[in-house]
């Protein structure tokens, strides 16, 4: 069991080293450095929820914006064929549709970002609790009770009864 944990720990350390090397490569790029030193980059660095919301919004809006630009290019060809009135109507309707889609995506990206943040906080709390519990149980098995006033949790009671 200890060797599996050691192997897992070594793999995680190797992965952390690779991730740090990758992040250094990105951060050493001159354009990234210029962006991070700009007021907008500093604002995003100080507000991670806004950054996550913006990332989700941009990721989700690429396809509708691409479809809109394809539609605009297709209607531009139709202009060459003298269909000016139809083009104006189609671009107006598609522009309104794009506006509606992007507004919906903006609201959805805020919700997704909020869910991701809550999941991260809840997950890290659970993992921290599990780790603290495993450390406490392991310490108690090796050296006796941790304290005289220790009250057993429901999980400890179920473990001791089985």
UniProtKB/Swiss-Prot annotation:
Main location: endoplasmic reticulum
Cell compartment(s), UniProt: Endoplasmic reticulum membrane; Lipid droplet
One Pfam family here: Promethin
Superkingdom in the source lineage: Eukaryota
GO cellular component, one term: endoplasmic reticulum membrane
Segments traversing the membrane: 43-63, 66-86, 88-108, 110-130
Record topology, Lumenal segments: 64-65, 109
Membrane topology: Multi-pass membrane protein
An example Gene Ontology biological process: lipid droplet formation
Topological domains annotated Cytoplasmic: 1-42, 87, 131-162
Keyword Cytoplasm attributed: no
Sequence similarity: Belongs to the LDAF1 family.
Functional description taken from the UniProt entry: Plays an important role in the formation of lipid droplets (LD) which are storage organelles at the center of lipid and energy homeostasis.
Name of the protein described by the UniProt record: Lipid droplet assembly factor 1-B
């Amino acid at each position: 069991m200890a060797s599996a944990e050691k192997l897992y720990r070594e793999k995680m350390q190797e992965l952390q080293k690779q991730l740090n090397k990758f992040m250094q490569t990105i951060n050493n790029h001159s354009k990234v450095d210029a962006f991070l030193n700009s007021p907008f980059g500093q604002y995003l660095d100080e507000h991670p929820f806004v950054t996550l919301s913006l990332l989700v919004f941009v990721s989700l809006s690429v396809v509708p914006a691409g479809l809109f630009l394809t539609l605009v290019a297709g209607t531009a060809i139709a202009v060459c064929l003298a269909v000016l009135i139809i083009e104006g109507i189609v671009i107006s309707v598609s522009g309104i549709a794009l506006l509606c889609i992007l507004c919906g995506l903006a609201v959805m990206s805020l919700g997704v970002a909020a869910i991701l943040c809550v999941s991260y906080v809840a997950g890290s709390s659970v993992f921290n609790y599990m780790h603290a519990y495993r450390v406490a149980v392991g310490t108690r098995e090796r050296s006796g009770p941790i304290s005289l006033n220790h009250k057993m949790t429901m999980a400890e009671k179920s473990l001791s009864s089985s």
